[in-house]
UniProtKB/Swiss-Prot annotation:
GO terms for cellular component: cytosol. The lineage of its organism: Bacteria, Pseudomonadati, Pseudomonadota, Gammaproteobacteria, Legionellales. Pfam families: CsrA. This is Translational regulator CsrA 1. A key translational regulator that binds mRNA to regulate translation initiation and/or mRNA stability. Mediates global changes in gene expression, shifting from rapid growth to stress survival by linking envelope stress, the stringent response and the catabolite repression systems. Usually binds in the 5'-UTR; binding at or near the Shine-Dalgarno sequence prevents ribosome-binding, repressing translation, binding elsewhere in the 5'-UTR can activate translation and/or stabilize the mRNA. Its function is antagonized by small RNA(s). HAMAP family: CsrA (MF_00167). The keyword RNA-binding applies. Belongs to the CsrA/RsmA family. GO terms for biological process: mRNA catabolic process; negative regulation of translational initiation; positive regulation of translational initiation; regulation of carbohydrate metabolic process. Transmembrane segments: none annotated.
Length: 68
């Protein structure tokens, strides 16, 4: 994991073309407000929402082995 230190107003760029920007908007106590600018085709979710989406995805049926 890459760990970066940023202060209010500073940003990081993600992707070969820098197409995703994460900007620190505010630090208050133990909370950080971040702004994320990403192309529309890239989904951005909080972790707990992402986990819920993954849990709700339909499960693939098991593959049955062919018997001769």
């Amino acid at each position: 994991m890459l760990v970066l230190t940023r202060t209010n107003g500073q940003a990081i760029k993600i992707g070969n073309e820098g197409e995703i920007t994460v900007t620190v908007l505010e630090v208050r106590g133990n909370q950080v407000r971040m702004g994320i600018d990403a192309p529309k085709h890239i989904a951005v979710h909080r972790e707990e929402i992402y986990q819920r989406i993954q849990e709700e995805k339909p499960k693939a049926p098991p593959i049955l082995e062919e018997v001769e």
